[in-house]
Amino acid sequence: MNFTAFKASIAREAPPSELSLALQALWWDAKGDWDKAHECAQAAEGAAGDRAHAYLHRKEGDQANAAYWYGRAGQPVSTSPLPAEWEAVVRALLIS
C-alpha cells in the first residue's frame, strides 16, 4: 500500500486488514479515535509500535511519556508540526 491509498482508506469504517498494528494506530488517529489508536500502539511490538506510541502521546500533550517512547523507538523527540510528523511516520512505516 502506498501513502495515497492509505489516506484514501481512512474514509472506510475499518482499517485495511493488511495494515500492521502501528499503521492501524495511525489510521485510527486520523479517524479521530485516539483511544483506539492508543490500543493499537500498545499492542504493536518493536520500534514501529514505539514510534506510533510516541506520536500519540506527543499529540495528547504528554511530552514526558512521548519522550520515553521516542527513546524506545531510537528516535529524537519530534518538533515537527503534528500533521507533518503523522505523514512522515506513516510513509516510513509503509516502506518498512
Segments from the language model and where they lie:
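Repeat-mediated protein-protein interaction surfaces in helical alpha-solenoids
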Residues: 1-13, 26-39, 91-92
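TPR/TPR-like (Sel1-like) alpha-helical repeat modules
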Residues: 45-47, 59-80
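Structural register within alpha-helical repeat arrays
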Residues: 24, 51-54
